[in-house]
């Protein structure tokens, strides 16, 4: 499976092996070749997962509470938060099980651990696919709201958005279940294709939106006979925002999909084996992305922040 390291870690913990690395990483050790391996403490990983879990739960609760936020855009943001919640939750669950197995606090059979591993894999990959798809859906929604403003409410109707959301969830869960059960490497290629598609989609749409915004700002500048630097400053700020948005997406997701690509194309190569040993680092970056997503897409909304305060006050 693409997550060979995680599976070996679960089964290795069950059998009380001294180390919990992937079989690819062990092969690299036998060669004696030096590998750069970054260790992520379980406590840090679980702490980041908990922050992501709480943060995204608050986003879902705030959107569910306020009927004014039941618009197409916030539906996509809510689903993004829910999928990010599942990404962090599934990885936290696996890490917690490994810790309990290693501590001897959880006794179970290898077959049960294998079933648990497959279940976590399905949950992880389906939620990752959903997260990627909903990031792309938000980009499309923003694009339509800008370039088809007069037709937006006729294009992005709530029933149509609900069908899109249902299709994304069903397709992600179904494909992850089938591919992880029957075709081990296909799920890696599927995730890679979705990642590259969403990256290109976001880049094209946001660059087009930035270019149109710069043209609009330039038109206003000419209309009011202002100096060009004002327009240039707007363009630089927009370019910086776009760079940060795409950069965070690529830096957080890119290493994980590099891992999946190498698992498919060079599973036994020495250099690839060294990269596989840092699989937990790549998962940690994805968890960091699930923490950043609400800051980018949700908490910039004043309406949502007000509702979030109400949710927090009610919880006390």
UniProtKB/Swiss-Prot annotation:
Entry GO CC: plasma membrane
Glycosylated sites: 29
Bilayer topology: Multi-pass membrane protein
GO biological process, one term: adenylate cyclase-activating G protein-coupled receptor signaling pathway
Tagged with keyword Membrane: yes
UniProt KW keywords: Cell membrane, G-protein coupled receptor, Glycoprotein, Lipoprotein, Membrane, Palmitate, Receptor, Transducer, Transmembrane, Transmembrane helix
Gene3D superfamilies reported in the protein's UniProt record: Rhodopsin 7-helix transmembrane proteins
Annotated PANTHER family: G-PROTEIN COUPLED RECEPTOR
Quaternary structure, from the entry: Interacts with MGRN1, but does not undergo MGRN1-mediated ubiquitination; this interaction competes with GNAS-binding and thus inhibits agonist-induced cAMP production. Interacts with OPN3; the interaction results in a decrease in MC1R-mediated cAMP signaling and ultimately a decrease in melanin production in melanocytes.
Descriptive protein name: Melanocyte-stimulating hormone receptor
Chain's gene name: MC1R
């Amino acid at each position: 499976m693409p997550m060979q390291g995680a599976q070996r870690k679960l089964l290795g913990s069950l059998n009380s092996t001294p180390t919990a690395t992937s079989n690819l990483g062990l092969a690299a050790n036998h060669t004696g070749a030096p590998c750069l391996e970054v260790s992520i403490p379980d406590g840090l990983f679980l702490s980041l997962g908990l922050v992501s879990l709480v943060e995204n739960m608050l986003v879902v609760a705030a959107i569910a509470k306020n009927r004014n936020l039941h618009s197409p855009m916030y539906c996509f943001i809510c689903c993004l938060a829910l999928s990010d919640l599942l990404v962090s939750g599934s990885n936290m669950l696996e890490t917690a099980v490994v810790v309990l197995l290693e501590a001897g606090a959880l006794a179970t059979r290898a077959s049960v651990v294998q079933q648990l591993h497959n279940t976590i894999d399905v949950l992880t990959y389906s939620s990752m696919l959903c997260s990627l798809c909903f990031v792309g859906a938000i980009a499309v929604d923003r694009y339509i709201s800008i370039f088809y403003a007069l037709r937006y409410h006729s294009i992005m109707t709530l029933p149509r958005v609900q069908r899109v959301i249902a299709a994304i969830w069903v397709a992600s869960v179904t494909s992850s279940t089938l591919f992880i059960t029957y075709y081990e490497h296909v799920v890696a290629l599927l995730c890679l294709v979705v990642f590259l598609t969403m990256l290109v989609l976001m880049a094209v749409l946001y660059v087009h939106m930035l270019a149109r915004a710069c043209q609009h700002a330039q038109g206003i500048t000419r209309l009011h006979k202002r100096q060009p630097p004002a327009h240039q400053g707007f363009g630089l700020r927009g370019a910086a925002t776009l760079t940060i948005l795409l950069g965070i997406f690529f830096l957080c997701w890119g290493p994980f999909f590099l891992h999946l690509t190498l698992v498919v194309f060079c599973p036994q190569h020495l250099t690839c084996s060294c990269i596989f040993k840092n699989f937990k680092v790549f998962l940690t970056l994805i968890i960091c992305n699930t923490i950043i997503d609400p800051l980018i897409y949700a908490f910039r909304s004043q309406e949502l922040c007000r509702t979030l305060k109400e949710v927090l006050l009610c919880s006390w």
